[in-house]
């Protein structure tokens, strides 16, 4: 007979918001490429030694759109949703003078990005609260705002 205790958890980490799971997606077994699954959907893919590549069409489109809108290398950006933090990680390499703020409601997702997706938060500002509330309360203004928060197929 099966028991709940005998069943291994499918979550790498269970947070207050998500079942967070990591999946190795390396095609050659040599390069470390990993996906982050939140509940049932891949929310990002990152490579240890290649922060410049966006591995999903979604991330590539958001990055490309933002890069066409930046007024200069010292732009300010507000990202709603962190996931693997692939875009901020790339921007840290390209635009070290940019002021990037990320609203990620789940601190466990941010910790997972740091521990397993090679994200260094020291250059950015991270806000662990609902982005709508933060934007309503802050006096800060941003050159770019990217909405990349979703749960499975719904935007909050």
How should these model regions be labeled?
Residues 1-39:
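Basic, ligand-binding patches in group-transfer machinery
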Residues 2-3, 40-45, 65-67, 144-147:
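Generic detector of short, locally flexible boundary/turn motifs and exposed helical patches
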Residues 15-18, 44-47, 82, 131:
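Glycine-centered flexibility motif
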Residues 29, 43-45, 134:
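A broad, structure-centric signal for solvent-exposed, well-ordered loop/edge residues
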Residues 40-52, 154:
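Acidic/histidine-rich helix-loop elements
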Residues 53-156:
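The AdoMet/dcAdoMet-binding core of the Class I SAM-like
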């Amino acid at each position: 007979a099966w028991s709940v205790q005998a069943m291994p958890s499918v979550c790498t980490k269970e947070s207050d918001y998500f079942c967070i799971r990591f999946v190795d997606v390396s095609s050659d077994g040599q390069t470390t490429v990993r996906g982050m699954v939140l509940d049932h959907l891949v929310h990002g893919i990152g490579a240890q030694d290649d922060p410049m590549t966006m591995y999903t069409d979604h991330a590539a489109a958001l990055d490309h759109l933002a890069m066409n809108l930046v007024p200069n290398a010292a732009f300010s950006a507000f990202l709603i949703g962190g996931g693997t933090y692939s875009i901020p990680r790339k921007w840290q390499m390209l635009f070290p003078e940019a002021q990037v703020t990320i609203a990620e409601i789940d601190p466990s997702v941010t910790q997972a990005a740091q521990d397993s997706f090679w994200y260094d938060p020291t250059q950015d500002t991270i806000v662990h609260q609902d982005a709508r509330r933060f934007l309503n309360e802050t006096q800060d203004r941003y050159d770019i705002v990217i909405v990349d928060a979703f749960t499975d197929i719904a935007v909050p």
